[in-house]
């Protein structure tokens, strides 16, 4: 083993490496639990410092630094300094010797047949002609790359250049780091890169800032727009603007950092949303009174796919011991032959649906992590062999392909979410919840989540559109030199849009699930109030006859209570004594059936059940509405007779997060607050 001139371990042959093609390392990266991996990402995101060494940058660290209000500081490894210096000196020395190198003594791309000895001037011209982006005017022009994406790109480009194969001074990397740490962000154009010879156009604006180009602008820590001089002053960069030496301009712009930087932040969110979708599916099972059998480990073991197995295991863990599942089991045992044997696909096949999407997102994450730790410019400076190697690592195909695949996975997750909320708001499918999850007293003046479902349809449609690939829209560029190109940043931008839409859907669905949880709580208390009232009225009216003797109708009480168990509360609770609703119809039916079997006793006023029906119904009308209202008020006041079952479930932390930490409230038509206000709280929170 020996250390080469770039400061890295060198090997005379790839074949001496046990994993020369890197397949083993790639496979090893995908072992273990995705959930554990996401937990690690979140821990890394929360770290206060990111130390760059060139080889071990994580997407979570990129996401942390990218945050516009980030307080994360970036440090450069001093150990990398010698390698960076060696490649920079090699370029200067080779030019002094008259060595002909691409981008050092030649023109660029299709015009590389041109030659010059003015190395510094050539780099300045490179930056000038690449400053071809359009920003427009006004804050709403929408043609500026988000500051978070620019910060991600700056971090990733530093990491690449630290590896010492690019021929750039360490001081320039320190200057970019100073801008990051001072929260000074150069303005880059949103569009104009095909991520083929890297992200040439947007990265040229970072180079323009470093060289003090008069058109360079940045956003300062307070959000104001500043020029390059003010940016350098705020960042505390000494010695003024840089005079680019040979190769340095090319080193700055000829890389995939913008596409891979944005892809990193996108995938950080996508991984978390993927885990959240697994948890949400389990909560969906709880509020829908589903059958947890769909998570049985044998089913998924026999299918073999790791994403599916893990998704099912997460759902099984959440549902194990769930109070909702215990209650649902009892309900399924009532008249089992009259109920569906299985739940619909949106619940029953959710592990099979989500598993492959998680595998795709995980694979894309590893691909992008390899990219942000790669050397991706051209030419590469190999000091150990005293040569510049001309290749094409700037081609951002891993970004374009990974982002296209991720976007398709995100769209599939969103589609499942839409299918689930469509069941949840539909009283034909939701096992007794009110239509539109209306929580108010009068369903004629409360349409609950109707607007939310319409919005979800819009989100889902746009998400499905975005699922279409970007990478099959390649145009030959740069005089047919860049005749195939990755479109990496374009695909990353579209995936960022898709993630944003999935966040909208997730926020809406989380509030809907919490609404359903609280409606189940209300349902239980209503049912208990109805049972108690019917039982008490039965005892008063049906137990004895006119003469005080025991009456045959006393045997009806048990059957009357069974009616309440079988009837969905929200089908009648807004007017429980209405004959248009099923409760009174079914209660009367019980009494009529007993009367019909009462035989000769019906002829006697003292023993006639028919003659008891009117008295029973009148007393019920007098008592039941009051008891139902009292039950509602007690739930609203937090003094309900029956506690909310969610507190006995493993999904409770998610409910508590939405209700208590974020403050999203139970929605009713009686309140002024709109659903969107509550969705917004969750959207900002996640």
UniProtKB/Swiss-Prot annotation:
Tissue-level expression: Mostly expressed in stems and bulbs, and, to a lower extent, in roots, leaves and flowers.
Q: In which pathway does it act?
A: Alkaloid biosynthesis; Phenylpropanoid metabolism; trans-cinnamate biosynthesis; trans-cinnamate from L-phenylalanine: step 1/1
Keywords linked to the UniProt accession: Alkaloid metabolism, Cytoplasm, Lyase, Phenylalanine catabolism, Phenylpropanoid metabolism
Quote the subcellular location field of this record.
Cytoplasm
Its BP terms in the Gene Ontology are: alkaloid metabolic process; cinnamic acid biosynthetic process; L-phenylalanine catabolic process
Might you give the EC number(s) for this enzyme? 4.3.1.24
Q: Point out residues bearing the modification 2,3-didehydroalanine (Ser).
A: 197
Q: At the top level of its lineage, which domain of life is listed?
A: Eukaryota
Subunit note: Homotetramer.
Family statement drawn from the similarity comment of this UniProt entry? Belongs to the PAL/histidase family.
Q: What is this protein called?
A: Phenylalanine ammonia-lyase 2
Question: Species name for this entry?
Answer: Narcissus pseudonarcissus (Daffodil)
């Amino acid at each position: 083993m020996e250390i080469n001139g770039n400061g890295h371990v060198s090997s005379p042959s790839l074949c001496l490496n046990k994993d020369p093609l890197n397949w083993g390392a790639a496979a090893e990266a995908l072992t273990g639990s995705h959930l554990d991996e996401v937990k690690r990402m979140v821990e890394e995101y929360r770290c206060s410092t990111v130390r760059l060494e060139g080889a071990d940058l994580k997407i979570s660290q990129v996401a942390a630094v990218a945050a516009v209000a980030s307080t994360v500081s970036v440090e450069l490894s001093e150990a990398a300094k010698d390698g960076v210096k060696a490649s920079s000196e090699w370029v200067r020395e080779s030019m002094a010797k008259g060595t002909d190198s691409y981008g050092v003594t030649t023109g660029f791309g299709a015009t590389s047949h041109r030659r010059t000895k003015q190395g510094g001037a050539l780099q300045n011209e490179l930056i000038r002609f690449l400053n071809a982006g359009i920003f427009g005017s006004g804050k709403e022009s929408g043609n500026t790359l988000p500051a978070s994406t620019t910060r991600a790109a700056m971090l990733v480009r530093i990491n690449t250049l630290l590896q010492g194969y690019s021929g750039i001074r360490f001081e320039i990397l320190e200057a970019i780091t100073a801008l990051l740490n001072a929260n000074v962000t150069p303005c880059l154009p949103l569009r104009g890169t095909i991520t083929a010879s890297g992200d040439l156009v947007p990265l040229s604006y970072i180079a323009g800032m470093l060289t003090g180009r008069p058109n360079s602008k940045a956003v300062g820590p307070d959000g104001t727009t500043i020029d390059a001089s003010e940016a350098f002053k705020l960042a505390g960069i000494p010695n003024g603007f840089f005079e680019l030496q040979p190769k340095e301009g090319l080193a700055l712009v000829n890389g995939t950092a913008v596409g891979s930087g944005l892809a990193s932040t996108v995938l950080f969110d996508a991984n978390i949303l993927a885990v959240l979708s697994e948890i949400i599916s389990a909560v969906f099972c709880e509020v829908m009174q589903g059958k947890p059998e769909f998570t049985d480990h044998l089913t998924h073991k026999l299918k073999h796919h790791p994403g599916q197995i893990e998704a099912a295991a997460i759902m099984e863990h959440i549902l194990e011991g769930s109070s909702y599942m215990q209650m649902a089991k009892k309900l399924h045992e009532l008249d089992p032959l009259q109920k569906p044997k299985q739940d619909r696909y949106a619940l029953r096949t959710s592990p099979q649906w989500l598993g492959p999407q998680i595998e795709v997102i995980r694979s894309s994450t590893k691909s992008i992590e390899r990219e942000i730790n790669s050397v991706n410019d051209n030419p590469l400076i190999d000091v150990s062999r005293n040569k510049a190697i001309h290749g094409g690592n700037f081609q951002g195909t891993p970004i374009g392909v990974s982002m296209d695949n991720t976007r398709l996975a995100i769209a599939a997750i969103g589609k499942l979410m839409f299918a689930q909320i469509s069941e949840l708001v539909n009283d034909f499918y939701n096992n007794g919840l009110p239509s539109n999850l209306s929580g108010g007293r009068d369903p004629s003046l409360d349409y609950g989540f109707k607007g939310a479902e319409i919005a979800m349809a819009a989100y889902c449609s746009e998400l499905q559109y975005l699922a279409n690939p970007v990478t099959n829209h390649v145009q030959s560029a740069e005089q047919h030199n860049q005749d195939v190109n990755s479109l990496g940043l374009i695909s990353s931008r579209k995936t960022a849009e898709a993630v944003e839409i999935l966040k909208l859907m997730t926020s809406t669905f989380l509030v809907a699930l919490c609404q359903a949880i609280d409606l189940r709580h209300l349902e239980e208390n209503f049912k208990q109030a109805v049972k108690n009232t019917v039982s008490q009225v039965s005892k008063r009216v049906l137990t004895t006859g006119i003469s005080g003797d025991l009456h045959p109708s006393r045997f009806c009480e048990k059957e009357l209570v069974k009616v309440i168990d079988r009837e969905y509360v929200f089908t009648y609770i807004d007017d429980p004594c209405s004959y248009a609703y099923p409760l009174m119809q079914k209660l009367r039916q019980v009494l009529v059936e007993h009367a019909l079997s009462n035989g000769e006793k019906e002829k006697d006023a003292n023993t006639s059940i028919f003659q008891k029906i009117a008295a029973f119904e009148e007393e019920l009308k007098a008592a039941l509405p009051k008891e139902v209202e009292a039950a509602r008020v007690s739930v609203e006041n937090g003094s309900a007779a029956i506690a909310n079952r969610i507190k006995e479930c493993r999904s409770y932390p998610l409910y508590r997060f939405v209700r208590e930490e974020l403050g999203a409230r139970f929605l009713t038509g009686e309140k002024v607050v709109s659903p969107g206000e509550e969705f917004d709280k969750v959207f900002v929170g996640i």
